[in-house]
Curated annotation (Swiss-Prot):
Species, as recorded: Proteus mirabilis (strain HI4320)
Membrane topology: Single-pass membrane protein
HAMAP family: ATP_synth_b_bprime
Role summary: F(1)F(0) ATP synthase produces ATP from ADP in the presence of a proton or sodium gradient. F-type ATPases consist of two structural domains, F(1) containing the extramembraneous catalytic core and F(0) containing the membrane proton channel, linked together by a central stalk and a peripheral stalk. During catalysis, ATP synthesis in the catalytic domain of F(1) is coupled via a rotary mechanism of the central stalk subunits to proton translocation. Component of the F(0) channel, it forms part of the peripheral stalk, linking F(1) to F(0).
Keywords annotated in UniProt: ATP synthesis, Cell inner membrane, Cell membrane, CF(0), Hydrogen ion transport, Ion transport, Membrane, Transmembrane, Transmembrane helix, Transport
GO cellular component: plasma membrane; proton-transporting ATP synthase complex
Protein name: ATP synthase subunit b
Gene expressing this chain: atpF
Origin: domain of life: Bacteria
Subunit structure of this chain's protein: F-type ATPases have 2 components, F(1) - the catalytic core - and F(0) - the membrane proton channel. F(1) has five subunits: alpha(3), beta(3), gamma(1), delta(1), epsilon(1). F(0) has three main subunits: a(1), b(2) and c(10-14). The alpha and beta chains form an alternating ring which encloses part of the gamma chain. F(1) is attached to F(0) by a central stalk formed by the gamma and epsilon chains, while a peripheral stalk is formed by the delta and b chains.
Family the UniProt entry places it in: Belongs to the ATPase B chain family.
InterPro entries xref list: ATP_synth_B-like_membr_sf (IPR028987), ATP_synth_b/b'su_bac/chlpt (IPR002146), ATP_synth_F0_bsu_bac (IPR005864), ATP_synthase_B_chain (IPR050059)
Membrane-spanning intervals of the chain: 11-31
GO molecular function: proton-transporting ATP synthase activity, rotational mechanism; proton-transporting ATPase activity, rotational mechanism
């Protein structure tokens, strides 16, 4: 055989092989490659969407945390105001109670003073009556009478 015929035979066999591969082997390989490219592209887009969703979730979580902190601060401030108000009310109530007790003590003291004065008046009246009885019993001169009156005044 000659070298040209061998090369020609090999060239024909190669062309037939290439045609066979293009017709039966190449389309499934290309379909698999395209399918894989599509899966990779879908995976990348899913990853990108997931990243965006994660960023949105982080932002939302940050907003919710800030809102919760603000609400907690408002609750704390409200509780402090309520506590202060309750303390002030308790102080006012205690002051009223103290004033009431002081007023009651003063009225009791005044009543005791009046009772003591009344008792003293009764004693003075008794002394005056006793002194008058002594003066009447002792008919003495005017100097003795004046002396007895001075003693009564000193006793009062």
């Amino acid at each position: 055989m000659n070298l040209n015929a061998t090369i020609l035979g090999q060239a024909i066999a190669f062309v037939l092989f290439v045609l066979f591969c293009m017709k039966y082997v190449w389309p499934p390989i290309m379909a698999a490659i395209e399918k894989r490219q599509k899966e990779i592209a879908d995976g990348l887009s899913s990853a990108e969407r997931a990243k965006k969703d994660l960023d949105l979730a982080k932002a939302d979580a940050g907003e919710q945390l800030a809102k919760a902190k603000a609400e907690a601060q408002a609750i704390i401030e409200s509780a402090n105001k309520q506590r202060t108000q309750m303390i002030e009310e308790a102080k006012a109530e205690a002051e009223q109670e103290r004033s009431k007790i002081v007023a009651q003590a003063q009225s009791e003291l005044e009543a005791e003073r009046k009772r003591a004065r009344e008792e003293l008046r009764k004693q003075v009246a008794m002394l005056a009556i006793a002194g008058a009885e002594k003066i009447i019993e002792r008919s003495v001169d005017e100097a003795a009478n004046s002396d007895i009156v001075d003693k009564l005044v000193a006793e009062l």
